[in-house]
Amino acid sequence: MPSARLQQQFIRLWQCCEGKSQETTLNELAALLSCSRRHMRTLLNTMQDRGWLTWEAEVGRGKRSRLTFLYTGLALQQQRAEDLLEQDRIDQLVQLVGDKATVRQMLVSHLGRSFRQGRHILRVLYYRPLRNLLPGSALRRSETHIARQIFSSLTRINEENGELEADIAHHWQQISPLHWRFFLRPGVHFHHGRELEMDDVIASLKRINTLPLYSHIANIVSPTPWTLDIHLTQPDRWLPLLLGQVPAMILPREWETLSNFASHPIGTGPYAVIRNSTNQLKIQAFDDFFGYRALIDEVNVWVLPEIADEPAGGLMLKGPQGEEKEIESRLEEGCYYLLFDSRTHRGANQQVRDWVSYVLSPTNLVYFAEEQYQQLWFPAYGLLPRWHHARTIKSEKPAGLESLTLTFYQDHSEHRVIAGIMQQILASHQVTLEIKEISYDQWHEGEIESDIWLNSANFTLPLDFSLFAHLCEVPLLQHCIPIDWQADAARWRNGEMNLANWCQQLVASKAMVPLIHHWLIIQGQRSMRGLRMNTLGWFDFKSAWFAPPDP
């Protein structure tokens, strides 16, 4: 019998007997474990061989045998739990232990660096599963980061300085305002072994032609081997950066026929997905990656929903052994913000916008927050920390305003915290705030109407590219803000948009009301090198490494 199964049987027997040695019979024990008398005898003999108990059998009708426990079920359960942790079987660990507080304590104690069979393993604790990693779909902040570790694109953007770099394409040139040419590397392989072909690249870029930022791509052809020509309907100075974004990452052309591709995707990036469940995401360094092989062999993201109730300001890489060290922190490039929905009469009413933005000002939200959040929140007066576009102007409550509807996407604890503060403030003004939580996909599509929306945005480098690109690619914003998005996109592509002025107009009209900038923190081990926090609050796994202990 496999050791794990035998351990489970012993723990169950120990629990049924309440850990007490006793006189009993094979029939009674078999009934406790719901097995045959013969199988019960085999179990007892095997457990006795392991040194867990003694079984002194008595022969004869009416005679009772002696069962003595030498090992406690708790000790064996702890040993089994340790084995499951080392094997990264978090789902089985949760079933075995049951108690969430104990599971969390065990997980935290095993965070950070592990060295097993010559491999460097990094363990990270996160509050929710990362089940959708499909480029071009609605991806949240962390899924966006993970997708960048799994997939490659024609170009890539350096997370530290925002500079454009080569990826699958090693060079490119602009032939004319409407014609770009990219030269691709040969010998690039997907994680499932097949070599990348030009048809994969063409299919990947054609599949996103329906997205607003890619709708101006008229044609994609390969005139010669490993050469790609992209023809546009509008000039686009940002095209090389646009092709380095997550939606433009390269998928195998047969991706729709592959099982569970969204949660177990196959790319050409530095890491391949090994496991992705509700309890764990495991990615492993791809030995055939066309660039520098990752220095960390394996990254395990353990999911523990209970930590969602804590302030989401830090990424925890290290357990409690010794003092936690703050490796890096930064104020996010982005903010939480209110979005007024012009499709509802209250959302479109300028008096309602002025008054709500006055009573729900950033300083009011921070003032009414608990101290643990005040340490991580900074009042926002623009979409970026360096901007001061919003001015707090006293406004009178509109006559007849008795209720408002606020909607945000679920699985985000700080949304609930901020919404609760808003509800408290508005109640003091005799306004009822009805709160709705919807899925991230529903939020992204924006087909549901709400007076106001609570959103957040994290912009990546370079900011003059990503800020408009991020806002333009969220359908919800286009539904709520009635401006000519296509005309603005054309001006942005031509380099004719003053981005700061454009954002200031959105804030001045109260279409968007900045609320809070968030401090992002990574805590971990001093032995980790090459760790540079990006604007998403994560770091590039393939560039990090562990320094060996001093000799």
UniProtKB/Swiss-Prot annotation:
Region feature Solute-binding, mapped onto this chain: 163-492
DNA-binding region(s), chain positions: 26-49
Pfam families on file: SBP_bac_5 (PF00496), SgrR_N (PF12793)
MF-aspect GO terms: DNA binding; peptide transmembrane transporter activity
Domain HTH marR-type: start-end pairs: 1-116
Keywords, sorted A to Z: Activator, DNA-binding, Repressor, Transcription, Transcription regulation
Source organism, top-level taxon: Bacteria
Entry's Gene Ontology BP terms: negative regulation of DNA-templated transcription; peptide transport; positive regulation of DNA-templated transcription
Its job: Activates the small RNA gene sgrS under glucose-phosphate stress conditions as well as yfdZ. Represses its own transcription under both stress and non-stress conditions. Might act as a sensor of the intracellular accumulation of phosphoglucose by binding these molecules in its C-terminal solute-binding domain.
NCBIfam families assigned to the protein according to its UniProt record, in alphabetical order: PRK13626.1
Protein name (Swiss-Prot/TrEMBL): HTH-type transcriptional regulator SgrR
